[in-house]
UniProtKB/Swiss-Prot annotation:
The modification N6-acetyllysine is found at residues 163, 241, 249. The modification N-acetylserine is found at residue 2. It holds the Pfam family RRM_1. Identified in a IGF2BP1-dependent mRNP granule complex containing untranslated mRNAs. Part of a complex associated with the FOS mCRD domain and consisting of PABPC1, PAIP1, CSDE1/UNR and SYNCRIP. Interacts with IGF2BP2. Interacts with GTPBP1. Interacts with EIF4G1; the interaction requires RNA. Interacts with EIF3B and RPS3. GO terms for biological process: 3'-UTR-mediated mRNA destabilization; cellular response to amino acid stimulus; cellular response to estradiol stimulus; cellular response to nitric oxide; cellular response to putrescine; cerebellum development; circadian regulation of translation; CRD-mediated mRNA stabilization. Keywords: Acetylation, Biological rhythms, Cytoplasm, Isopeptide bond, Methylation, Nucleus, Phosphoprotein, Repeat, Ribonucleoprotein, RNA-binding, Ubl conjugation. It comes from the Eukaryota. Methylated by PRMT1, in an insulin-dependent manner. The PRMT1-mediated methylation regulates its phosphorylation. Arg-343 is dimethylated, probably to asymmetric dimethylarginine. InterPro entries: CARG-binding_factor_N (IPR012956), Nucleotide-bd_a/b_plait_sf (IPR012677), RBD_domain_sf (IPR035979), RRM_dom (IPR000504). Residues 1-89 are annotated as: Disordered. It comes from Rattus norvegicus (Rat). This is Heterogeneous nuclear ribonucleoprotein D0.
Length: 353
């Protein structure tokens, strides 16, 4: 917590830090306050940096108040303490559940009311289709205590709104995969690869360029994918939505792997450049990844999401783009992805974000 956030005079700040800590931490905070009396006597916020209470006491207090820490997260605040971050991530991993197989008619209230019988529900969310507003058939529940998750898992079958649902423990990824790939839409098929490389090479070293081909005409399509060596060029490029490449005004979007896309979807996105491409905060504050392949590779399986063109390289299928990503302008052919003219790199399944 920064000095400005801590606020108040030094003595009050030290006392506040001491409240949330253990006896040892309280004593440490008081000693620190006494040693910093000169600083505490001033009107500045610097007196609130008592080491004994800030790190230990604040971590315990905020860790115990789930809803408070989540609100801070929603508002974009972050705690720079690695100890705080690791503890909060570990606790959320124990408190959070993925709920699959939901009825299309199930509401957030239904979800919360059902799982409240297992313990205090701090928050819950349903994942909705951004175009239709319809439920995707799955969501997440955050409990106040990990014991509630155990109770849910101990029950063999769960039914909600007349349908058997599929609750699972949520799993947190330890690292965030950097985004190094972009989608370039509205590109003239006649634009030479050299011209594309020259323009985007001005932002950073280009690792590979994918030039998709129509599998019927064997001609290039009006878009491409570019992978950079580092993540920084993507951040620079995403500062503008449109770029002039050759004679074309191109729309740029972040291309994300399946795993990256899953991370972004868990509990929404906050902060980071990827989300700005969608017009809201992006970049996962908690990198949640369920690892439940049946909800992804089969288009969310029984959740009826095949129509969105989600699986494998079909993520580039333009049936999916038209109905979900709104890329109709780049979809003159409705025939999946076809051949890809590619220079360097390896093939992977990506999605524009």
């Amino acid at each position: 917590m920064s000095e400005e956030q801590f606020g108040g005079d030094g003595a009050a700040a030290a006392a506040t830090a001491a409240v949330g800590g253990s006896a040892g931490e309280q004593e440490g905070a008081m000693v620190a306050a006494a040693q910093g009396a000169a600083a505490a006597a001033g009107s500045g916020s610097g007196g609130g940096s008592a080491p004994g209470g800030t790190e230990g006491g604040s971590t315990e207090a905020e860790g115990a108040k789930i809803d408070a820490s989540k609100n801070e997260e929603d508002e974009g605040h972050s705690n720079s303490s690695p100890r705080h971050t690791e503890a909060a991530t570990a606790q959320r991993e124990e408190w959070k559940m993925f709920i699959g197989g939901l009825s299309w008619d199930t509401t957030k209230k239904d979800l919360k009311d059902y799982f409240s019988k297992f313990g205090d529900v701090v928050d819950c969310t349903l994942k909705l289709d951004p175009i239709t507003g319809r439920s995707r058939g799955f969501g997440f529940v955050l409990f106040k205590e990990s014991e509630s998750v155990d109770k849910v898992m101990d029950q063999k079958e769960h039914k909600l709104n007349g349908k058997v649902i599929d609750p699972k423990r949520a799993k947190a990824m330890k690292t965030k995969e950097p985004v190094k790939k972009i989608f370039v839409g509205g590109l003239s098929p006649d634009t030479p690869e050299e011209k594309i490389r020259e323009y985007f090479g001005g932002f950073g070293e280009v690792e590979s360029i994918e030039l998709p081909m129509d599998n019927k005409t064997n001609k290039r399509r009006g878009f491409c994918f570019i992978t950079f060596k580092e993540e920084e060029p993507v951040k620079k490029i995403m500062e503008k939505k449109y770029h002039n490449v050759g004679l074309s005004k191109c729309e740029i979007k972040v291309a994300m792997s399946k795993e990256q896309y899953q991370q972004q979807q868990q509990w929404g996105s906050r902060g980071g450049f990827a989300g700005r491409a969608r017009g809201r905060g992006g970049g996962p504050s908690q990198n949640w990844n369920q690892g439940y392949s049946n909800y992804w590779n089969q288009g969310y399986g029984s959740y009826g999401y095949n129509s969105q063109g989600y699986g494998g390289y079909g993520g580039y299928d333009y049936t999916g783009y038209n109905s979900y990503y709104g890329y109709g302008d780049y979809s003159n052919q409705q025939s999946g992805y076809g051949k890809v003219s590619r220079r360097g790199g390896h093939q992977n399944s990506y999605k524009p974000y």
